[in-house]
């Protein structure tokens, strides 16, 4: 039986890189502050077994400043890499799991950029990486989705890499970015066995992720954390454009810890995986056992919305490329009657 244990969201202020020359200095500042927050919560916050950081907590959202894909890549990190190696030492020191997210480059995929969330184990290893699926399709980012070159990606890593879940002494852990606003993202992790989903988020309308998290947790009978970012520092955008409002939700959709602040903050709550497993074994209104995949599946297969393998030859270079695709998708959905054109 797994005893209940504390989990923490470290809502760090995040300094943004504004040009490639600043990369080393800014990431060092963000990383050092992150280490301080870990030490603080381990000393005064109940010694959590898992700590989570926001998306982009090392570099900031570099879409604010990057002029092209080359600058994006110059301001990104490798995972594993120098920065995660430092975090790994802290994970070993305290015997904890650390989750966070950042823009990533990978030598295996030249020219590509990923928005990646990761988990580091108490042994100091990167044991999970989840590369955001719904990123190119947002028409807001030029990070690659695994879906952009899906066939090649799955051939290299297997389908499990799309929804990575790790089996640990603390239960089965999944990790997600702001991608959790799509219900399929969280459900995909749950279908792979996830019981505790570590959400690393940054932007959005205030309270948006909190409300989404309550629904995602309830409908998937899973614990879910939303670690928002504190204030945005060193950027031309307002400091309060971050999400803040970090939240921890239980498997019934009940908020068990939260902060209503946009400033730096730490929240902690207890996770009871054994009780979750009992809840998932109930015979009445079991949200997972009741899923009718045979009925819902064909609807997705016939939808013909966002296409896979669109950028399998060359990584996306500009959001204008994605805008062309979204117009094609909308036209198909209008013609099928899925959507109705506005008057």
Regions found by a protein language model. Give the residues of each.
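Cys-nucleophile CN-hydrolase/nitrilase-fold catalytic domain and related Cys-dependent amidase chemistry
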Residues: 25-28, 35-132, 137-138, 203-215, ...
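Conserved hydrophobic/aromatic positions in well-ordered beta-strands
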Residues: 8, 118-120, 247, 267
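CN hydrolase (nitrilase-like) catalytic-core segments centered on the catalytic cysteine
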Residues: 79-99, 171-270, 278, 287
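C-terminal beta-strand edge segments of enzyme domains
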Residues: 215, 229-343
């Amino acid at each position: 039986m797994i005893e209940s244990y504390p989990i923490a969201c470290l809502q760090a202020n995040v300094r943004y890189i504004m040009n490639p020359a600043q990369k080393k200095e800014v990431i060092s500042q963000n990383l050092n502050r992150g280490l301080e927050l870990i030490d603080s919560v381990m000393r005064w916050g109940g010694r959590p077994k898992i700590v989570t950081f926001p998306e982009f907590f090392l570099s900031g959202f570099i879409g604010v400043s990057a002029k092209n894909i080359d600058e994006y890549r110059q301001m990104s990190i490798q995972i594993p890499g120098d920065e995660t190696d430092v975090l790994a030492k802290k994970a070993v020191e305290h015997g904890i799991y650390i989750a966070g997210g950042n823009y990533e480059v990978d030598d295996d995929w030249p020219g590509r950029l990923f928005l990646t969330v990761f988990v580091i184990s108490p042994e100091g290893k990167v044991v999970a990486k989840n590369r955001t699926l719904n990123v190119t399709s947002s028409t807001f980012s030029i990070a690659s989705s695994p879906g952009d070159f899906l066939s090649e990606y799955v051939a290299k890593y297997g389908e499990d890499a799309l929804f990575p879940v790790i089996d640990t002494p603390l239960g089965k852990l999944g990790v997600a970015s702001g991608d959790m606003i799509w219900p399929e993202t969280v459900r995909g992790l749950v279908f792979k066995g996830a019981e505790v989903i570590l959400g690393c988020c940054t932007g959005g309308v205030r309270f948006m992720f909190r409300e989404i998290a309550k629904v995602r947790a309830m409908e998937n009978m899973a614990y879910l954390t939303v670690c928002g970012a504190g204030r945005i520092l060193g950027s031309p955008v307002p400091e309060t454009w971050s999400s803040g409002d970090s939240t921890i939700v239980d498997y019934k959709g009940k908020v068990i810890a939260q902060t209503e602040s946009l400033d730096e903050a730490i929240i902690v709550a207890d996770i009871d995986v054994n009780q979750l497993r009992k809840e998932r074994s109930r015979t009445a209104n079991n949200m997972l056992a009741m899923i009718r995949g045979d009925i819902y599946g064909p609807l997705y297969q016939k939808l013909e919305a966002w296409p896979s393998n669109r950028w399998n030859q060359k990584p996306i270079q500009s959001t204008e490329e994605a805008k062309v695709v979204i117009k094609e998708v909308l036209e198909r959905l209008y013609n099928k009657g899925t959507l109705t054109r506005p008057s």
